[in-house]
Curated annotation (Swiss-Prot):
Single annotated GO MF: NAD binding
Keywords: NAD, Oxidoreductase
Any single GO BP term: organic acid catabolic process
InterPro entries the record matches: 3-OH-isobutyrate_DH-rel_CS (IPR002204), 6-PGluconate_DH-like_C_sf (IPR008927), 6PGD_dom2 (IPR013328), 6PGDH_NADP-bd (IPR006115), HIBADH-like_NADP-bd (IPR029154), HIBADH-related (IPR015815), NAD(P)-bd_dom_sf (IPR036291)
Name assigned to this protein: Uncharacterized oxidoreductase MT0794
Family membership: Belongs to the HIBADH-related family.
Binding residues annotated for NAD(+), in chain numbering: 11-25, 101, 252
EC annotation from Swiss-Prot or TrEMBL: 1.1.-.-
Active site: K176
């Protein structure tokens, strides 16, 4: 195992809307914090809080665990592999954690490229937004080797209350992309529901209040995400009665919504697709002798 200090020095690159509240949670880290942002004014509050402002990315390379929260793959690659980037100056054993949402192949490629130098590339995208970061309640999905994951757990726990070791480098990003896919598909579904409600002359703001209120109790889509496989359930699975009940309710309500859409002349393609795929998606597909309900 690579030798490393008992209390590592931390570095943070990128102090924007997401990075700033995360880095702020590290100001009292006993090993110290070095920050860098291309905007000098973004670093000023951190210097006032006791952090060291770096003059360039290369100065941050002196840290032992370095977090990066920049915009996209190109910026991530530039910070790490440019002529004056982290890869040129970081010592063996350094952990570079990428919190930006990037392509999974970017993390894999960087990890392979820097492995001979003894530099650990960790993809650690977060979920929860700036508000959760400020409270230390982010979820972080980590793609890392076992050694690196153990080393980042304590500092990352300053800004995250849920740390998931998703697997090797690239796995954290894959989990984040699946999570974000659910978010944005649900946004599209929300827009479809609003079109139906609007065509029925309903108050859309009131509908939003109902959705937020009920989701705070039911948990939204996450409420059915407890299985460790998407394969059809075994007959004796203890969750089967619950999900068969959910299937029945879902197919009934989706059928009613689609029928209402026909009455008010609103196309509901996501609802139609949901009706077709709900049973199999829940792991309780209809037997061949029991076709799914259709409108």
């Amino acid at each position: 195992m690579t030798a490393h200090p008992e209390t590592p020095r931390l570095g943070y690159i990128g102090l924007g809307n997401q990075g700033a509240p995360m880095a702020k949670r590290l100001l009292d880290w006993p090993g110290g914090l070095t920050v860098f942002d291309v905007r000098v004014e973004a670093m000023a509050p951190f210097v006032e809080g006791g952090a060291t402002a770096a003059a360039s990315v290369s100065d941050v390379a002196e840290a032992d665990i370095i977090s990066i929260t920049v915009f996209d793959d190109a910026q991530v690659s530039s910070v790490i592999t440019a002529d004056n980037g982290l890869a040129t100056h970081a010592k063996p054993g350094t952990i570079v954690a990428i919190h930006s949402t990037i392509a999974d192949t970017t993390a894999v490629d960087l990890a392979e490229k820097l492995k001979p130098q003894g530099i650990h590339i960790v993809d650690a995208p977060v979920s929860g937004g700036a508000a959760a970061a400020a409270k230390g309640e982010l979820a972080v999905m980590v793609g890392a080797d076992d050694e690196a994951f153990q080393r980042i757990k304590e500092p990352f726990s300053r800004w995250a209350s849920l740390l998931i070791h998703a697997g090797e480098p690239g796995a954290g990003t894959r989990m984040k992309l699946a999570r974000n896919m659910l978010t944005f598909v649900s946004y599209a579904a929300a827009a479809e529901a609003q079109r139906l409600a609007e065509a029925c002359g309903l108050d859309l703001v009131a509908l939003g209040k109902v959705v937020r209120h009920s989701d705070s109790f039911t948990g939204g889509a996450g409420a059915i995400m407890f299985r460790n496989t998407t394969a059809p359930m075994e007959p004796a699975d203890p969750l089967r009665p619950l999900l068969e009940h959910t299937r029945g309710l879902g197919e009934k309500d989706l059928s009613l919504a689609l029928a209402l859409g026909e009455v008010v002349s609103v196309d509901l393609p996501l609802a139609q697709l949901a009706l077709q795929r709900l049973a199999a998606g829940l792991g309780v597909p209809h037997p061949d002798t029991e076709p799914a309900k259709e409108t």
